Amino acid sequence: VTTVLCRPENGFALDPDAIPDDADLVVIGNPTNPTGVLHPADLLRGLRRRGRLVVVDEAFMDAVPGETGSLARERFKGLVVVRSLTKHWSIPGIRAGYIVGDRTQVRWLADRQTPWSVSAPAIAATIACTSRTATPEARDRAATLARWRDFLQGGLRGRGIDYAPSAAPFVLARLGRGAHAALRERGVAVRRADTFPGLDSTWVRIAVRPPGMTNQFFTALDAVRLLQPTS
């Protein structure tokens, strides 16, 4: 297994040349966790090769207004898209998702699916979240998240804090060493990012929340004097 790192100096963009030519399976999140970077659809299509399966995890694509860059509507041999219902609808305990792709590939995977792999509550949630009435609600949620995300990123930018421009319901920011613990002491929880390959303890992942909650985060951040990125 080869882990391909997306570097901050390149805006966490994927370098397709970094993927080994002989890789028969390539898995990538789009938007990627924890950077929130939305990789161009053409770049992901270009990863296909004879004898290779490309799996694109679009668990956070619902947060992108209009789902720009999604490959879920395309059917290419050698390409499978994984989608989740638990992120956008805030139902993590349901554990429901689905795949889309070439009919032959989907049938091959279905034949190997574990019996009773989806619970009755998960089935009910899936039906509800994919219904016609859910579609406008999903669009509204994406638009609202975009406004909240802009507010968060604007506050980070105004404070001179380095962050990765995000298309996801979170933002990766470089608050400095000790920020995670210092914020927690003030009642604010952010996700430590040093558990992700290629990142250190200066980075944290911040959830996109309503402006009122985001202002509480900024108040705590200002109080701990972590206003500039540190190495």
Task: Kindly give the residue locations of the regions a language model identified.
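Short beta-strand-to-loop capping motifs
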Residues: 101, 173-176, 208-210
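Conserved small-domain helix->loop->beta segment predominantly found in fold-type I
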Residues: 150-174, 194-201
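Catalytic-core regions built around general acid/base machinery
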Residues: 42-50, 70-75, 108
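PLP-dependent enzyme catalytic core of the Aspartate aminotransferase-like
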Residues: 185-186, 196-231
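Active-site phosphate-binding strand-loop segment of PLP-dependent enzymes
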Residues: 7-62, 228
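Short, conserved active-site loop motifs that form the nucleotide-linked donor/cofactor pocket
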Residues: 52, 78-79, 188
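PLP-dependent aminotransferase class I/II
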Residues: 78-157, 161-164
